[in-house]
A protein has these predicted regions:
Chain C
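N-terminal hydrophobic or amphipathic helices and topogenic motifs
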Residues: 23-55, 325-331, 336, 340-377
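Short, glycine-/small- and polar/acidic-enriched structural segments
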Residues: 24-164, 168-173, 177-184, 202-215
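Short linear loop/turn motifs
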Residues: 60, 67-68, 207-210, 275-282, ...
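Pocket-lining segment of extracytoplasmic ligand-binding domains
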Residues: 86-87, 166-285
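Surface-exposed patches in mature extracellular/periplasmic domains of secreted proteins
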Residues: 100, 160, 249-260, 360-362
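Secondary-structure end/capping motifs
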Residues: 230-355
Length: 273, 253, 377
């Protein structure tokens, strides 16, 4: 009886250890976040920098709640989100369609590549002020900066993805007398989707940069403005709250694309049993 | 469907604007419902012949015809199957098999009915909703075969369809193909590099020379149908294999 | 093992701190705002003519954003910085303990330029006018708020347009009726355009400076309260060095312009202009030997401009004129001295702008005249 009980105990023990390990693994991203917070708290407690340069987490938390309650954060957040939304649609729309055209017609790449490469290798921060002069200090200029920064990765990924479509499957579609639209819808689109979505992850995070760069140039509204204005009022906790909000937007967009991948690319998770 | 090649020549363009002869001139006639295997040394233009018949490759001179109508592009009645199963990894087994019907505008219900009817013959009834990544090489090839059969074509063009499979699977699936063929009686032109396979399956074995491929032998296979695996031990079978091999590699060459 | 590690760490820190200390006694950073510009001439003179060196400083200049200058000084990362008094008030309200020890600009440099048919300027006329401003931040914005307040107006009475630092273009295109400007710079450019008939149908402009209405504290030297308490001698030496460089610049702008050439790459420096400036600088040095009064020196500066204008094209002279006009904002009987009333006026403006809460900050701790008094003649 005792033997059995002992055996039972060890089994139970090993199982609970395993469950614990599993739970630890599941929560490890959370753990790294907690570790980061602890490190931050430790750094501020050590007073290497005065609190007005590196404010403690609690002060940032307070600033967050205050900015939330006063509506300040949401007001500027919604401005930035709107600019990003339209910028993403514009930039992705142009990037995807030009990318597709280039992939199908190599002569286009030959003609357009100097312009596109020049466009890409010029840092947006340098000519963002010009965009503001051309498109005005309203939301349009920020939508354009976002679109410009989003455009390139979506373009390149589209070209790569459409070129990578299996020539054998193209033969198959031809042998089945598929129309150009059917080839696009049933072959090119699903085949290119993984690479295009990977590019979308990059674009999504870049979109935040685009909008914020635009807002830095014209002072008015949006998170870029809020960060400058907080800085000018020596409100470091609010600066950090705003920066973290930008991070949160980028992460949410990234996660949204991951979600799309999960739904649309379910087949990639399948493998031989 | 009757398939005919008349003085067919296919050249390829080389990068320096020259011309590389790949095939022919060659003339060949395949009767309706006949099973013809094409063998020859590698690079003899077997695949080019199949692709030209399928309307995927343009003839440089001469002509190809199906039931005396010149073939200038892909036909719905002429289905081609490649060595690679060539499945769409994002489609399930039934959706891969149903692709030709879907492209032809057949509605979902009728498409599924047609596909599910085929699954048992293909031994795929338990894999209807699997994705290609979950299939073995043999099963993937069965799906590819299903995708060809489902079109109810009058002729099948098979380009080394089992070349990538292991010997056991290959034997098994070859006989399954013969079963299917017996039922539907399409014209079949199959390229293979396996002489045993050719003799076991075909009514006629056509031997091509090395590049540019010309017809060097046309051997009738006088074995009764249905074919069975134990026929390979028969004297007739062995003689036919020897004869075919000699045509590919002439002893005095 | 732990002992060895401890010793290694200690010796590492000793090396580090000795390197730091050595650099400290030689090198001194002064943090400025904006970009290298003729308006920073006293610093160029201070370096070129050894005013800093005579007090034991080997000065390097860095240009940063104003809040960054302030935070670096407050955190002890740099000992000296130049910011406006308004930033000192705002930053002190947010826990940065800095002290303003030397008032460089005696007059607040912002003003408003507007069309004037008779040369007269009336702020009340601004009602319902379109007014351009670089942006709703910094000295331009606080200057405008003060001006409107002094005329009994508020921002709601005018149409405010953010135009960046493009006042001359936007004003002359007629897109705004008035513009907030730096009185030592843009009015000069606009007047030149008016004279050239290149400013729409504008015949005459008028400038109302903030300083003519209200005495607002402006740019000056800041240190951390910690440094002021710990090493007052160092602060005193810097105040003395800067005072001496500022005085030299005010007294001999020709020499100051020449000294600035190495620091401001874009400063016009045609050989003819430089030769003439060298002659003028030498003559001015002789003149200064005679112990002239402040008024006499001011007159000598105007004479310089007349002489130069006869010999050199007016485009090449713009930056020299900017220097002269800026000197007018610096010059005073007692350089460096700061008045509590100018701090109170600024604090009122900031409260009006909603940048400062209602509890009154301790303005008397924001600045100190101790180091100005301590400058030996």
């Amino acid at each position: 009886m005792a033997e059995v009980g002992k055996k039972h105990d060890t089994e139970l023990g090993s199982r609970s250890t395993r469950t614990l390990l599993l739970q630890l693994r599941r929560s490890s991203p959370l753990l790294s976040l907690v570790a980061l917070l602890l490190l931050w708290q430790l750094l501020t407690s050590a007073e290497i920098y005065p609190a007005f340069i590196v404010p403690p987490p609690a002060a940032v938390g307070e600033a967050f709640i205050e900015a939330l309650q006063s509506g300040l954060l949401l007001k500027h957040l919604s401005v930035t989100l709107e600019e990003m939304f339209f910028g993403l649609i514009l930039g992705l729309g142009i990037g995807l369609s030009i990318g597709y055209a280039i992939a199908k017609m190599p002569i286009l790449e030959y003609t357009l590549s100097p312009v596109i490469v020049a466009f890409q290798s010029t840092p947006i921060v340098a000519y963002a002020p010009l965009l503001v002069i051309w498109f005005g200090s309203g939301p349009t200029s920020k939508i354009v900066t976002t679109a410009v920064i989003v455009f390139f990765p979506s373009l390149v990924n589209t070209i790569v993805a459409v070129r990578a479509v299996s020539p054998n499957l193209r033969d198959l579609m031809t042998s089945l007398n598929a129309t150009p639209w059917q080839t696009f819808r049933q072959l090119e689109l699903p085949s290119a989707l993984p690479v295009v979505l990977a590019g979308l992850k990059t674009s999504a995070t870049l979109a935040v940069i685009g909008a914020v760069v635009g807002e830095f140039v014209t002072q008015g509204s949006g998170l870029g403005f809020l960060v400058t204005s907080a800085r000018n009022q020596y409100d470091t906790p609010l600066v950090i709250v705003t920066v973290l909000t930008m991070t949160a937007i980028a992460l949410s967009l990234y996660s949204f694309v991951v979600l799309l991948e999960w739904r649309w690319l379910a087949w990639r998770r399948r493998s031989k049993p | 469907m009757k398939l005919s090649l008349r003085e067919l020549v296919v050249d390829f363009k080389t990068p320096d604007e020259g011309r590389l002869p790949a095939l022919g001139p060659i003339s060949l006639e395949v009767s309706p419902g006949e099973f013809v295997c094409i063998v020859g040394p590698s690079g003899c233009g077997k695949s080019t012949l199949i692709r030209t018949l399928a309307g995927l490759q343009r003839a440089t001179s001469g002509s190809v015809a199906g039931d005396d109508v010149p073939i200038t592009g892909p036909l719905a009645t002429l289905a081609i199957m490649f060595q690679d199963a060539n499945l769409m990894p994002w489609r399930t087994v039934i959706d891969n098999i149903g692709l030709p019907l879907e492209l032809a505008g057949v509605d979902k219900a009728r498409r599924h009915a047609a596909v599910y009817e085929l699954l048992p013959q293909l031994h795929l009834q338990n894999f209807a909703l699997s994705y290609p990544a979950e299939l073995s090489g043999g099963m993937a090839q069965r799906v590819a075969l299903g995708r060809v059969i489902v079109q109810r074509p009058k002729a099948l063009l098979l380009d080394e369809p089992f070349g990538a499979l292991d010997a056991m699977t290959r034997e098994k699936i070859s006989l399954e193909l013969l079963d299917l063929w017996r039922e539907h009686r399409q014209t079949v032109v199959m390229v293979t590099h396996d002489i045993n396979e050719a003799v076991l399956m075909a009514d006629r074995v056509v031997v091509l020379s090395s590049r540019p491929g010309k017809l060097v032998a046309d051997i009738a296979i006088a074995l009764e149908r249905p074919r069975a695996i134990n026929m390979i031990y028969r004297e007739t079978f062995l003689r036919l294999v020897r004869e075919t091999r000699a045509a590919i590699d002439p002893p005095d060459a | 093992m732990r002992k060895i590690l401890g010793r290694a760490l200690i010796s590492f820190f000793i090396i580090l701190s000795s390197v730091g200390a050595q650099a400290d006694s030689l090198q001194e950073r002064i943090l400025l705002t904006f970009i290298p510009n003729i308006q920073f001439a006293p610093f160029y003179v201070g370096i070129a003519d050894g005013h800093f060196a005579r007090q034991g400083f080997d000065v390097t200049l860095e240009h940063l954003q104003e809040p960054d200058v302030l935070d670096l000084v407050a955190a002890g990362q740099a000992d000296f910085g130049i910011v406006s008094g308004e930033q000192v008030i705002l930053a002190r309200a947010k826990g940065r303990d800095v002290v303003y020890v030397y008032e460089w600009f005696q007059e607040f440099p912002v003003g408003i330029v507007m069309v004037s048919d008779d040369g007269g300027a009336d702020l009340e006329n601004l009602t319902d006018m379109t007014v351009g401003i670089p942006g709703r931040f910094g000295a331009s914005y606080s200057g405008l708020t003060t001006l409107l307040q002094s005329a009994g107006l508020s921002e709601d009475d005018i149409e405010l347009n953010e135009i960046g630092f493009n006042a001359p273009d936007v004003f002359c295109l007629g897109a705004v009726d008035a513009a907030v400007v730096y009185v030592n710079n843009e009015p000069l450019q606009i007047r030149k355009r008016v004279a050239a008939g290149d400013c729409g149908d504008v015949r005459e402009i008028a400038v109302v400076s903030v300083a003519s209405r209200v005495d607002l504290v402006s740019n000056g030297l800041i240190v951390s309260a910690d440094l002021a308490g710990r090493d007052p001698d160092k602060v005193q030496r810097m105040a003395s060095a800067f005072n001496s460089a500022l005085k030299a610049t005010i007294n001999n702008p020709a020499a100051a312009y020449l000294a600035s050439g190495t620091f401001v790459e874009t400063l016009p420096g045609e050989p003819a202009l430089l030769t003439l400036l060298r002659e003028l600088a030498a003559e001015q040095a002789v003149f200064l030997e005679t112990d002239p009064t402040r008024e006499e020196i001011a007159e000598s500066r105007s004479d310089m401009l007349v002489l130069l204008a006869d010999a050199v094209g007016s485009d090449d002279l713009t930056q020299f004129e900017v220097l002269l006009r800026t000197i007018a904002l610096w010059d005073a009987d007692t350089l460096g001295h700061s008045d509590l009333s100018s701090w109170e006026a600024m604090s009122d403006t900031l409260r009006l702008m909603g940048l400062l809460s209602d509890d009154p900050p301790d303005l008397s701790a924001s600045f100190s005249n101790q180091f100005v008094t301590g400058i030996g003649e």
